Amino acid sequence: MSGSKLSTPNNSGGGQGNLSQEQIITGTREVIKGLEQLKNEHNDILNSLYQSLKMLKKDTPGDSNLVEEKTDIIEKSLESLELGLGEAKVMMALGHHLNMVEAEKQKLRAQVRRLVQENTWLRDELAATQQKLQTSEQNLADLEVKYKHLEYMNSIKKYDEDRTPDEEASSSDPLDLGFPEDDDGGQADESYPQPQTGSGSVSAAAGGYEIPARLRTLHNLVIQYASQSRYEVAVPLCKQALEDLEKTSGHDHPDVATMLNILALVYRDQNKYKEAGNLLHDALAIREKTLGPDHPAVAATLNNLAVLYGKRGKYKEAEPLCKRALEIREKVLGKDHPDVAKQLNNLALLCQNQGKYEEVEWYYQRALEIYEKKLGPDDPNVAKTKNNLAAAYLKQGKYKAAETLYKQVLTRAHEREFGLSADDKDNKPIWMQAEEREEKGKFKDNAPYGDYGGWHKAAKVDSRSRSSPTVTTTLKNLGALYRRQGKYDAAEILEECAMKSRRNALDMVRETKVRELLGQDLSTDVPRSEAMAKERHHRRSSGTPRHGSTESVSYEKTDGSEEVSIGVAWKAKRKAKDRSRSIPAGYVEIPRSPPHVLVENGDGKLRRSGSLSKLRASVRRSSTKLLNKLKGRESDDDGGMKRASSMSVLPSRGNDESTPAPIQLSQRGRVGSHDNLSSRRQSGNF
């Protein structure tokens, strides 16, 4: 071993000295050399003795004893030399082995040091990983709580009476399937419904091919079933119609392509994108073969394929299809047609999902120019396109440009609803008042909109679709942008107006549904606000105490012949301690959530129904009965009295001549009754 010491006799004084391993090995090597020389000398002497011994045995046998003794001594010395040489070689091998052991030991020590360091690192990493695991478990628990909360909120969303049409709209909006009146080829919420055209223009736009009326009816029926998620009815209906068309007209017929498009729409709603894609490819081949490669129907099918690829996230595959559809529409319809603008919007959306923002801006700006030129600056598509362009600006961080577009939309809506007067300093768009409040830090005393809430009247619902009101969306987006800039007071004003706009939009949709159910002529109806103003004036002039309130949607014919009121009666004031409900005998209590309505069966009793379709059927039956009864007893009525029909429940009170109080409900609910109206009028209870 290196550095080890061995004791050996000292030549000078016979004392003990310490030798290192290297010195011992060096001395051993010298000893081996000396022993080798002695061995060789002894071998030479031994050989000479052997020769002398042979000669003496021949000449004088008596003198050979001395030589033999010498020979024995030399042989013993030679054996001792060989033994010494062997031991010296063993010592040399042992020294070499000790050196190897020492080197291995040093190597193992270095490895131990490295392993100790690695172990320290691993312990640190393990501690960090355990900390991350603990944090992840905590986040997972929080996410589970949030997920359950969102699940609950989603479950009760359908019971929210203040939901706007955009919240109620489903993802089953029709695609561009070749039906001009349903030409909606946008993706999801980015769609742009186009103005309806007559049958003549439809035929002209289709290049002489007009879609049969039966296919239009079937399309609307399938859309209705799909919107109700009744795919088990819609799919067999489409397949049967497709089979019949193929038998009568053959596979390569435009009607077959149209039916393939309808079936593709149903499969799209079921998220069966592969089946829908196969059908659209088949329809595209048929239309290209029968109608030509530059036909508008081919562009519609290409657009549908692009939408389908977009829904699957295949934006690169969808972009060339959308561009080809754009080229066809520009060639057939002209570069300034609204359908071209709609296609530009779809193409911009695909490019936006790929991050091609320069192309996105160009497409949106060109679409905006077309809409403003052909449809006018007040068309809803202009505001929608500006909103989409502003969204693209936001994704690029161009907040100033987005803010400018939002303000343009709100300013135009303000001018359209309230007008613009340079003399009236208070007649300003809502964003101006919001920024003034932000600067002053308080509400203005002379706010022209009544705490800024009346501005929601400017948020009109697009009558051609159930998409969200553009102005309401703009209010929310600009409010979010103000919050990003730290303008919290201004954001609160816009958000408050957006909330009131949602409720106003819901009322307008309900009014439209009521008009459709009752078959009223929209052009001869007095607006709801005027009818309700007349009702309030009549109540104030009569001095009738207001024990209960009735929220109603009223319409009055301009000729004064009939007034129709659809009302919901409930208690105007409720005490916190009194939760009891005053409901006449024979009627059913209407809970608020989930919302149900009371409809009347044939026996005159009310039953609860939670289906809008059942409500419509009941309203139609009740309206028919009411009209028949009114026609049969029209001569008995006073000519100066205005006839009225009410869908509100009028409880019977026997022969009491006093005015019946409305039904008092602690929660809102809709009620309908018509069958006993004439009998009540005759008995004096009307």
Curated annotation (Swiss-Prot):
TPR repeats lie at residues 215-248, 257-290, 299-332, 341-374, 383-416, 472-505. Residues 1-23, 158-204, 520-558, 586-686 are annotated as: Disordered. It is found in: Cytoplasm, Cytoskeleton. Residues 20-160 form a coiled coil. The keyword Transferase does not apply. Residues 675-686 have a biased composition (Polar residues). GO terms for cellular component: cytoplasm; kinesin complex; microtubule. Keywords: Coiled coil, Cytoplasm, Cytoskeleton, Microtubule, Motor protein, Phosphoprotein, Repeat, TPR repeat. GO terms for molecular function: kinesin binding. Pfam families: TPR_10, TPR_12. InterPro entries: Kinesin_light, Kinesin_light_repeat, TPR-like_helical_dom_sf, TPR_rpt. Its main location: cytoplasm. Phosphorylation may modulate the process of mechanochemical coupling. Belongs to the kinesin light chain family. The light chain is composed of three structural domains: a large globular N-terminal domain which may be involved in binding to kinesin heavy chains, a central alpha-helical coiled-coil domain that mediates the light chain dimerization; and a small globular C-terminal which may play a role in regulating mechanochemical activity or attachment of kinesin to membrane-bound organelles. Oligomeric complex composed of two heavy chains and two light chains. This is Kinesin light chain.
